[in-house]
Amino acid sequence: MYYYLITLAVIALDQLTKWIVVQNMEIGQKIEVIPGFLYWTSYRNDGAAWSILEGHMWFFYLITVVVIGIIIYIMQKYAKGKRLFSISLAFILGGAIGNFIDRVLHQEVVDFVQTVWGNYYFPIFNVADAALSVGVVLMLVYVFVDDRKTKGIK
């Protein structure tokens, strides 16, 4: 059940950082954190990652509720005793709920983390997005390690 604590921590950190941005920054305002690389940039997104399907909130409500239900079911049924698997699901669940809260309460998601690599500006994201990404990477590691164990590869 420790993985639900991870989920709650992700949600709390996500909502706290978004609240700080909303309270202290104007939309479009940019604060340089690491020169030439990391900025806090206040942005609102009414779509999915990278503004995909902007303006289709009903779709995100439906998909998110279904995904959250599936993740909780999988956590209860299959994740017990599988540490990396349960942690990856906890990050994914926390990220999904964090952005869902924004969509329900504000019909948009607060994004603020902007990274720059040379001339490339990575799409602005938030803690929930980062948690989703970390969860997916951990899930891929779990699948790779589990596959190697199943095949007896060291």
UniProtKB/Swiss-Prot annotation:
UniProt GO molecular function: aspartic-type endopeptidase activity
UniProt keyword terms in alphabetical order: Aspartyl protease, Cell membrane, Hydrolase, Membrane, Protease, Transmembrane, Transmembrane helix
Transmembrane segments: 55-75, 84-104, 124-144
Primary subcellular site in the record, as a coarse category: membrane
GO cellular component terms, semicolon-separated: plasma membrane
InterPro entries: Peptidase_A8 (IPR001872)
Active site: D111, D129
GO biological process entries: proteolysis
Pathway assignment: Protein modification; lipoprotein biosynthesis (signal peptide cleavage)
UniProt keyword RNA-binding, yes or no: no
Cellular localisation: Cell membrane
Cited PROSITE patterns: SPASE_II (PS00855)
EC number: 3.4.23.36
Catalytic reaction annotation: Release of signal peptides from bacterial membrane prolipoproteins. Hydrolyzes -Xaa-Yaa-Zaa-|-(S,diacylglyceryl)Cys-, in which Xaa is hydrophobic (preferably Leu), and Yaa (Ala or Ser) and Zaa (Gly or Ala) have small, neutral side chains
Record's bilayer topology term: Multi-pass membrane protein
Entry annotated with the keyword Transmembrane: yes
Family designation: Belongs to the peptidase A8 family.
General function of this protein: This protein specifically catalyzes the removal of signal peptides from prolipoproteins.
UniProt name for this protein: Lipoprotein signal peptidase
